[in-house]
């Protein structure tokens, strides 16, 4: 079985104006995460080269904050061009919050392949986890990305206290968007966050993967944050459940599995890694 590996680079971290209860980058909570306005382009390129060396096909440029402004747009475009020059053949993904069709077209011109903007959860549950912007504004940004001609990467976070009905509603909204790829994150509580809920069980997490693939058979299901912590020694069962991709290395503010360990284990299990997107 061939699977897709993706890596992320947090190129602008922390001090986010939004009050998302699940996020340690929010300025509304005190955490000990690294905070910086801009990562040096040379460091981004270094991370991209390392991602490519570690068999990654996708490389995501992530910025904290509500959305794109002119300055941030220019910076992301600069980063995309720098990565393309030094680490060609990576599929570049941008994750920069709310964005207009015009802004997204500029990202596409700079070499961005796909735009990631997660709905996070259902329309009904979202007001319980964020009050500073609406679920509808997130949905609209996804429509904007499609209109701009970008491939769509849209998913969310499970295990925030949502009901099974919320999960069904969430997946129905994803069906409306029909994303190219859909990330699944499993919520891991942090003592500084307002959101404190029991961790998902392994069986429940694997069921979420199965249900997502069933709802979105044409989308690449990507298991991202929380994979190692929630699924532990059973984490590679996600592929039997329908996943076709994982995020390797570190996440936005938390450590992930060492990429080399993932690669060794996956090769031992007979997996190969996609080098192009079909």
Swiss-Prot record:
Gene Ontology biological-process annotations: biotin biosynthetic process
Name of this protein: Biotin synthase
Binding-site residues for [2Fe-2S] cluster, renumbered to this chain: 60, 95, 153
Cofactor note: Binds 1 [4Fe-4S] cluster. The cluster is coordinated with 3 cysteines and an exchangeable S-adenosyl-L-methionine. Binds 1 [2Fe-2S] cluster. The cluster is coordinated with 3 cysteines and 1 arginine.
Keywords from the named record: 2Fe-2S, 4Fe-4S, Biotin biosynthesis, Iron, Iron-sulfur, Metal-binding, S-adenosyl-L-methionine, Transferase
Enzymatic reactions: (4R,5S)-dethiobiotin + (sulfur carrier)-SH + 2 reduced [2Fe-2S]-[ferredoxin] + 2 S-adenosyl-L-methionine = (sulfur carrier)-H + biotin + 2 5'-deoxyadenosine + 2 L-methionine + 2 oxidized [2Fe-2S]-[ferredoxin]
Role played: Catalyzes the conversion of dethiobiotin (DTB) to biotin by the insertion of a sulfur atom into dethiobiotin via a radical-based mechanism.
Amino acids binding [4Fe-4S] cluster: 16, 20, 23
Record GO terms (molecular function): 2 iron, 2 sulfur cluster binding; 4 iron, 4 sulfur cluster binding; biotin synthase activity; iron ion binding
Family: Belongs to the radical SAM superfamily. Biotin synthase family.
UniProt subunit comment: Homodimer.
Coiled coil: none
Keyword 4Fe-4S: yes
Names of the cofactor(s): [4Fe-4S] cluster; [2Fe-2S] cluster
């Amino acid at each position: 079985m061939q699977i897709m590996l993706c890596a992320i680079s947090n190129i602008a971290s922390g001090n986010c104006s939004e009050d998302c209860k699940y996020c340690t980058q929010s300025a509304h909570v005190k955490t000990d995460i690294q905070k910086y306005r801009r990562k040096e382009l040379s460091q981004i390129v270094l991370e991209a080269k390392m991602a490519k060396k570690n068999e990654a096909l996708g490389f995501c440029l992530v910025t904290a904050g509500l959305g794109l402004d002119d300055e941030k747009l220019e910076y992301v475009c600069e980063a995309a061009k720098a990565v393309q020059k030094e680490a060609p053949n990576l599929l570049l993904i941008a994750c920069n919050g709310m964005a207009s069709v015009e802004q997204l077209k500029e990202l596409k011109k700079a070499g961005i392949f796909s735009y990631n903007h997660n709905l996070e959860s259902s329309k009904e549950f979202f007001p319980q986890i964020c009050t500073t912007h609406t679920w509808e504004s997130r949905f609209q940004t996804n429509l904007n990305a499609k209109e701009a001609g970008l491939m769509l990467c849209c998913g969310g976070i499970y295990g925030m206290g949502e009901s099974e009905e919320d999960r069904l509603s969430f997946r129905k909204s994803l069906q409306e968007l029909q994303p190219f790829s859909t990330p699944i994150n499993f919520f891991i509580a942090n003592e500084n966050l307002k959101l404190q809920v029991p961790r998902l069980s392994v069986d429940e997490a694997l069921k979420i993967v199965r249900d997502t693939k069933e709802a979105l058979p044409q989308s690449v299901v990507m298991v991202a944050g929380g994979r190692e912590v929630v699924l532990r020694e059973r984490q590679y069962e996600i592929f039997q459940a329908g996943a076709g991709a994982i995020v390797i290395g570190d996440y936005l503010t938390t450590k992930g599995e060492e990429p080399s360990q993932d690669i060794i284990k996956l090769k031992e299990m007979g997996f190969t890694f996609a080098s192009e997107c079909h």
